[in-house]
């Protein structure tokens, strides 16, 4: 009997009918706390990695090797005043940061950490993740409009256009995964990548979706960078033009909530990419399957997050028209073409997803 089964049976005996609700709340709390810790140290890892790329040390003053820097940053933001512009729509202005964070947390309900370890194992998990993650664009528009600032509104309009443009390409990428897996359940999608010729010979990583759907995987990941308004797609908050975009009038914890949502969304994009294209919790080689699946998922997510950071340190910022051109004239046609290719592939005798 596993640890979770032991806790479940013991809790059911102790609390009776109230236990399922209590157990669900405990799991949600644990996942939320872990995500917050991951965000804190993802920011530290980003600053360290970019520092090394710039041939400098990065944060190294607070705690040993700078490991307490995230705590200092949180305390600083907690002690700052939340400024409310006189001309702003007060309640909408304050609701917008909350609206960005809630969907970012809600997506984690359907992401499986390993076999059987998921908060809500629903059959429409992929559809749920896509629908919930697209709500964030409304919060960005609301923040720009409620601030009653032309610079904030300009940044919000850029964000809305960019997010909508790249959501279409991401949607097509998810449709292709749905076609090959035959299911919207994320656990079943991971399971569908554990079969085939290569998996039968112990080379699991060659049976994952990244290989047959490589162009789509690349498009999905780049679109994810654009969706999260990360460099080189960060024209929304381009420092040389409109400073912080829709966040220009925010301060303190209201400002911090936008950044919290951005980094949670980075982890969500990486976790979904690992689940849909990189086998989720599956080990790359069969002889390594004794290692818990959550270790492999965390390793894959960490590698993808490092690519996010590498892109920030490496590429210059795109112009707004270049971003739109890439989304509509390159990614969208390639995705449509690949849908047709995979459709014919699946109907042919060479179908590898049987």
Curated annotation (Swiss-Prot):
Domain of life: Bacteria
GO BP annotation list: aerobic respiration
Subcellular localization(s) per the UniProt record: Cell inner membrane
Transmembrane annotation, as ranges: 25-45, 91-111, 126-146, 170-190, 205-225, 253-273, 290-310, 330-350
UniProt xrefs under PANTHER family: NADH DEHYDROGENASE SUBUNIT 1, NADH-UBIQUINONE OXIDOREDUCTASE CHAIN 1
Function: NDH-1 shuttles electrons from NADH, via FMN and iron-sulfur (Fe-S) centers, to quinones in the respiratory chain. The immediate electron acceptor for the enzyme in this species is believed to be ubiquinone. Couples the redox reaction to proton translocation (for every two electrons transferred, four hydrogen ions are translocated across the cytoplasmic membrane), and thus conserves the redox energy in a proton gradient. This subunit may bind ubiquinone.
Protein name as annotated: NADH-quinone oxidoreductase subunit H
Species per Swiss-Prot/TrEMBL record: Burkholderia thailandensis (strain ATCC 700388 / DSM 13276 / CCUG 48851 / CIP 106301 / E264)
Phylogenetic placement of the source organism: Bacteria, Pseudomonadati, Pseudomonadota, Betaproteobacteria, Burkholderiales
Encoding gene, per UniProt annotation: nuoH
